[in-house]
Swiss-Prot record:
Keyword Cytoplasm recorded: yes
Keyword presence, Repeat: yes
The name this protein goes by in its record: Glutamine--fructose-6-phosphate aminotransferase [isomerizing]
Active site per the UniProt annotation: C2, K606
One example GO MF annotation: carbohydrate derivative binding
Residues of the Glutamine amidotransferase type-2 domain: 2-219
EC number(s) on file: 2.6.1.16
Organism encoding this protein: Pseudomonas syringae pv. tomato (strain ATCC BAA-871 / DC3000)
Protein's GO biological process: carbohydrate metabolic process; fructose 6-phosphate metabolic process; protein N-linked glycosylation; UDP-N-acetylglucosamine metabolic process
Domain of life where this protein originates: Bacteria
Function statement: Catalyzes the first step in hexosamine metabolism, converting fructose-6P into glucosamine-6P using glutamine as a nitrogen source.
Subunit field text: Homodimer.
């Protein structure tokens, strides 16, 4: 991890590589580097620990000018974040490699290569790859042949870009478990781990499939499958407004993306609602026939997407009467799973490249699930390509590492799934679907009303400026919302935060409550409100300070140690979507007060493409 850029052209490509790295900064990283085969016929590199801007300064002082090069932003997995461990890695000053992923057998390969005389200067698993490839080149002068041989010895995940001083007209790539995309130009071609890195030079992309190896030249691309057979991958044209990668009037991408939620929720609903019901064919032409067979749902996801799945469980069981299990992908893939008959496997991922979620999907195909369905924000991702059915969210590119608009659009998509399954199976109560469809049409307006509380929440954030711990509480479908609120706060403000069902207070968390631990609660006006109020009294009795986001009809008022922020009234089924907004804003303003890097919080990456 975390970002790869490569280029082969008739012009100097250093600026292209640098701009590509800047466009990948949102993914999170701790060091950066670039290697170029210069016009003087020498393979040279520049590396820096820290930001891409520091690498840019190094290149300003010692420029690299050439027509072939690779670049990388690293998120440390093996070896500390330092210049010595930064990519690209060299072998004999004639071969350079950048790598996303984890090589699981790197220790054994390292010892083997040491015995052959190779000297290691870093602590990374990547350096093993470049020396192994150099060793393979002793048997053949063809870099593509050597790469095909080398990857057979690698166990784990990798996305590789390779250049060789002896073959200065080509860029090699290999993909297994880590995404790579080729950017197709006119007399020049490019490579990246994310097409966003290349949008300044092309709008035409070719996505490598699992196991592919590619040889990229200025005027041609040749690809081989995992079996070594030549293959042609489709060229896809991508259109996205330039404003997606620009903060505009906002201080941070995260704040911009929070405020985009009414618009992207509207987009996610477009073309999917009839007059009184959800249009089932939005999931695909075979969806209705397949949904009629569904008796159970298994949801698998990671992080924020997992929280979306937890909310969906309340909807699927409470509205559609369909049993549902939700599991973290990294746990699901490593345990023995008992699959109930006619179970729909649902995976959720913003990027569609989350390593554990992809692995869980591939594992699910061997376990006898009825079919697979992806909820995803990227229509050309691996998750979408490998699933039977898909419902795309329409969040647009999400630059901030902490997910915001992707989460709310995932919730909308999952509610559409719930209503579609209930409609086909006839398990919804009479009038429920028509009511919810009408409320969904109003949802963007309700979200706008919540965003109008921005100034109020900014003032509430001041209560957290000197705090080190926070407790989030919710009941029912609001418990996963509380979990998401706690995750956002810890991600970007570095304040320790935990979430619990409010009914569990007396089973442990109450021991932590005092004047130094704020307690944040979401309180829609539903059948659990009175029980929640009792839980909050337990907090106040122990001196805890309450921040309550409560329905305007809930009858809750400010008092000593109690700060109530009135929320627009909304039907209970949609409350998890609405109540997410103030928790995102709260986390954002607390982080701003603490002076953290909101868009690129420490130690985190946007797209987790390794286990």
């Amino acid at each position: 991890m975390c970002g790869i850029v490569g280029a082969v052209a008739e012009r100097n490509i250093t600026a292209i590589l640098l701009e590509g790295l800047k466009r990948l900064e949102y993914r999170g990283y701790d060091s950066a580097g670039v290697a170029v085969f210069t016009n003087e016929g020498v393979l040279e590199r520049r590396r820096r620990s820290g930001k891409v801007s520091e690498l840019e300064q190094a290149l300003a002082g010692e420029p690299l000018i050439g027509r072939l090069g690779i670049a990388h932003t690293r998120w440390a997995t093996h070896g500390a974040p330092c210049e010595r461990n930064a990519h690209p890695h060299f072998s004999a000053d004639e071969l350079a490699v950048v790598h996303n992923g984890i090589i699981e057998n790197h220790e054994a390969l390292r010892e083997q290569l040491k015995s052959l005389g190779y000297v290691f200067v870093s602590d990374t698993d990547t350096e093993v790859i470049v020396h192994l490839l150099h060793h393979k080149l002793k048997d053949t002068p063809d870099l593509a042949v050597a790469l095909k041989s080398a990857v057979k010895e690698l166990h784990g995940a990798y996305g590789l870009a390779v250049i060789n001083a002896a073959q200065p007209d080509r860029l090699l790539a290999a993909r297994s478990g880590s995404p790579l995309v080729i950017g197709v130009g006119m007399g020049e071609n490019f490579l990246a781990s994310d097409q966003l890195a290349l949008r300044q030079v092309t709008d035409r992309f070719m996505y490598l499939e699992e196991g592919d190896i590619a040889e990229i030249r200025r005027d041609s691309v040749q690809i081989w499958t995992v079996d070594g057979l030549p293959v042609v991958r489709e060229v896809v044209q991508y259109h996205e407004g330039a404003e997606a990668a620009d903060k505009g009037e906002y201080r941070h991408f995260m704040l911009k993306e929070i405020h985009e939620q009414p618009k992207v929720v509207q987009r996610t609903l477009e073309g999917r609602l009839g007059q009184h019901q959800v249009l089932v064919h939005a999931f695909g032409p075979q969806a209705a026939e397949l949904f009629a067979k569904v008796r159970n749902v298994q949801i698998v996801a990671c992080g924020t997407s997992y929280h979306a799945g937890m909310v969906a469980r309340y909807w699927l069981e409470g509205l559609a009467g369909i049993p549902c299990q939700v599991e973290v992908a990294s746990e699901f893939r490593y345990r023995k799973v008992v699959v109930q008959p006619d179970t729909l496997f649902v995976s959720i991922s913003q990027s569609g490249e989350t390593a554990d979620t992809l692995a869980a999907l591939r594992n699910a195909k061997e376990l006898g699930f009825l079919a697979s369905l992806a909820i995803c924000n990227v229509g050309i991702s691996s998750l979408v390509r490998e699933s039977d059915l898909t419902l795309l969210t329409q969040a647009g590119p999400e630059i901030g590492v902490a997910s915001t608009k992707a989460f709310t659009t995932q919730l909308v998509a999952l509610l559409l799934l719930t209503l579609s399954l209930g409609q086909v199976k006839g398990s919804l109560e009479e009038g429920v679907e028509a009511q919810l469809v009408e409320e969904l049409r109003r949802l963007p307006t309700r979200l706008g009303e919540a965003l109008a509380m921005d100034g109020t929440i900014e003032k509430v954030a001041e209560l957290f400026a000197e705090k080190h711990h926070t407790l989030f509480l919710g009941r029912g479908a609001q418990f996963p919302v509380a979990m998401e609120g706690a995750l956002k706060l810890k991600e970007i403000s570095y304040i320790h935060a935990e979430a619990y069902p409010a009914g569990e207070l007396k089973h442990g968390p109450l021991a932590l409550v005092d004047a130094d631990m704020p307690v944040v609660t979401v309180a829609p006006n539903n059948e659990l409100l009175e029980k929640l109020k009792s839980n909050l009294q337990e907090v106040r009795a122990r001196g805890g300070e309450l921040i309550v986001f409560a329905d305007e009809q809930a009858g809750m008022k400010n008092g000593e140690g109690t700060h109530v922020i009135a929320m627009p009234h909304i039907i209970d089924a949609l409350a998890p979507i609405l109540y997410t907004i103030p928790l995102q804003l709260l986390s954002y303003y607390v982080a701003v007060l603490k002076g953290t890097d909101v868009d690129q919080p420490r130690n985190l990456a946007k797209s987790v493409t390794v286990e």
